Amino acid sequence: MRQNPDIEISLVGEEATIDLGAKLALNLRAGDCISLIGDLGAGKTTLSRGLIQAILGADTEVPSPTYTIVQTYETDPAPIWHFDLYRIESPHELIELGFEDAEDDIMVIEWPENAGSLLPSQRLIVELIFTDNGRSARLTGTTPEWKQRLNDIFDRS
């Protein structure tokens, strides 16, 4: 059963997806997990790029980790682990990649459903959906803290 999103916003153009990533970046803390859900081409890597470049600068190269599975970035307050689990066939593969080591840092996970039971339960879920006008993003916090942070980010109470 799908939970109703806390926030739903329209993303018209690639820049809007990058801007959403940048907004989320300003509120990240050590131990955070953001799971990105969406079809191929929905904007998961674009959102990740916006998030990482908002912290490290627009010149920072942020490639898709489709083939490397994970890219890490040294940031303050904690390193960011950008995972793309599209090619993962079993959650056991993630243990070899240090997935559990990343839980105290910041995790941004594309194709999180492939993590199985290793996926942290306390996370922000960002679902990117194709629409007639481009894309939309549905953001759902799995904890009261995430719900409050979403309200703060988007000036809602």
Predicted features and spans:
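Short phosphate-coordinating micro-motif centered on Lys-Gly-acidic
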Residues: I7, S90, L97-S157
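N-terminal pre-Walker A segment at the start of P-loop NTPase domains
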Residues: R2-G21
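Hydrophobic anchor at the beta1->P-loop junction of P-loop NTPases
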Residues: I34-L36
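Phosphate-binding P-loop
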Residues: A25-G31
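Conserved lysine of the Walker
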Residues: K44
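Conserved nucleotide-sensing/catalytic segment adjacent to the nucleotide-binding pocket
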Residues: V62, T66, V70-E113
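The conserved Walker
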Residues: L40
